[in-house]
């Protein structure tokens, strides 16, 4: 009986730590969003972040030099709470949603690096602060993976 209580206590502690880690990364994402909103408002004082604009940005197809159309959703699926797969390499990609993946937004320098890399790769230039703010706001709303078929 004592052994069972110890196992339950350990499992509850692990679940609590996991929940705190996920919440910390959601908090990191929110902090980064505030930074981008502030920058965007220096460019356009009337800027207001938008989940709708973030979703449109995430799903926007851009014609690549090879003629193929790509979007963030091409690798990350249309639901950022789902795991994705790299369109070229087939490599598995963990979900983007920080509510689902407690490693997303853990390292904000890496987030900045990935924004620069992917924006230049797909759009051909760095994303604006407004685009980044909207993108993260959208990711924060996606908390439920799609049901498996």
Task: Label every PLM stretch briefly.
Residues 2-55, 99-149:
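Post-cleavage N-terminal segment of exported redox proteins
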């Amino acid at each position: 009986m004592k052994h069972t209580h110890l196992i339950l206590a350990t499992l509850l502690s692990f679940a609590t730590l996991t929940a705190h880690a996920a919440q910390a990364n959601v908090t990191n994402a929110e902090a980064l969003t505030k930074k981008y909103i502030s920058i965007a408002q220096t460019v356009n004082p009337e800027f207001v972040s938008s989940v709708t604009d973030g979703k449109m940005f995430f799903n926007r197809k851009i014609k690549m030099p090879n003629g193929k159309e790509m979007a963030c959703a091409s690798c990350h699926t249309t639901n950022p709470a789902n795991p994705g797969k790299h369109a070229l390499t087939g490599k598995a990609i963990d979900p983007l949603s920080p509510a689902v993946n407690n490693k997303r937004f853990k390292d904000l320098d890496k987030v900045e690096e990935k924004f620069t890399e992917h924006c230049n790769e797909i759009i051909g230039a760095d994303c604006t602060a407004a685009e980044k703010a909207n993108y993260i706001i959208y990711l924060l709303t996606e908390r439920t993976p799609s049901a498996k078929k």
